[in-house]
């Protein structure tokens, strides 16, 4: 909320703060590493997305919008393009080489909550805040990237919004964190059906923007919870395999280490970050 991005040295017991970036003029909403790890992409309440060369500590590009930018996502195969979504419900595909919008995705949506590319990068999934009247049509939409059209807009008919969508690293499914206190499962190929017989439940959302993430091998799903706990689910059985009491306030995100499979990091509504082994 203080406009700052911190890069932390996970293993250092002394100099844990490796770098501090101050390029935004308002609170930061989302931060993503580029696939090669040389750049950081960040967005926020100043209605911009900013690309920073981490090694040089220099801002290389600014992408301006007429909305608070809430979520950003690099393309899985082409790090020169990324998606952005914001408070006005606008979704844009940007090219970092030109600094211009390549595609616009418009459908009178509410604020965008999350974005996720499919495995081949030809489609993406959006989740947005919706009114009760159109919740079955717009809560989760699968889009065609190049044609700018929805491939399916009635994926999730429950009366809940979904603050997080995540693609499985290998299987043809994606999951959505539902405000109904469960993680729903969908096929990531047409016709994008909800699995009505299996879900991940046990954690509590309580209106917090709580995220979930798959392990690198796809065998586990981790979710935060409003009671400050981390829930680890078995992917196949959907059963809770471990519950860790991590924070005093809501645990809003959990991430697996990109190389070391038994290391996870979590963050809390109170601003604290923990690493578990």
Where does each model-flagged region fall?
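Structural hallmark of WD40 beta-propellers
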Residues: 37-41, 50, 59-61, 78-83, ...
């Amino acid at each position: 909320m203080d406009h700052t991005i911190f890069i932390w040295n996970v293993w250092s017991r002394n100099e844990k703060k490796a770098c501090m970036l101050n390029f935004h003029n308002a609170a930061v909403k989302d931060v993503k590493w580029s696939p090669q790890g040389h750049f950081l992409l960040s967005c926020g309440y100043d209605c911009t997305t900013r690309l920073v060369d981490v090694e040089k500590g220099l801002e290389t590009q600014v992408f301006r919008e007429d909305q608070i930018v809430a979520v950003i996502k690099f393309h899985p195969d082409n790090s020169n393009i990324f998606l952005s979504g914001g408070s006005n419900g606008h979704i844009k595909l940007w090219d970092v080489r030109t600094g211009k919008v390549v595609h616009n995705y418009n459908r009178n949506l509410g604020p965008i909550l999350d974005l996720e590319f499919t495995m081949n990068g030809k489609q993406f999934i959006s989740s947005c805040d919706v009114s009760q009247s159109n919740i079955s049509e717009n809560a989760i939409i699968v889009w065609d990237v190049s044609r700018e059209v929805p491939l399916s807009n009635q994926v999730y008919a429950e009366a809940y919004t979904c603050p997080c969508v995540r693609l499985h690293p290998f299987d043809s499914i994606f999951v959505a964190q539902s405000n109904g206190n469960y993680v729903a499962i969908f096929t990531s190929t047409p016709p994008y059906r909800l699995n009505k017989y299996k879900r991940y439940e046990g954690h509590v959302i309580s209106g917090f923007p709580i995220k979930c993430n798959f392990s690198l091998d796809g065998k586990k799903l981790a979710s935060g919870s409003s009671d400050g706990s981390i829930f680890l689910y078995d992917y196949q059985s959907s059963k809770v395999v471990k519950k860790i009491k991590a924070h005093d306030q809501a645990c809003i995100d959990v991430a697996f280490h990109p190389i070391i499979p038994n290391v996870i990091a979590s963050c809390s509504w109170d601003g604290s970050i923990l690493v578990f082994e």
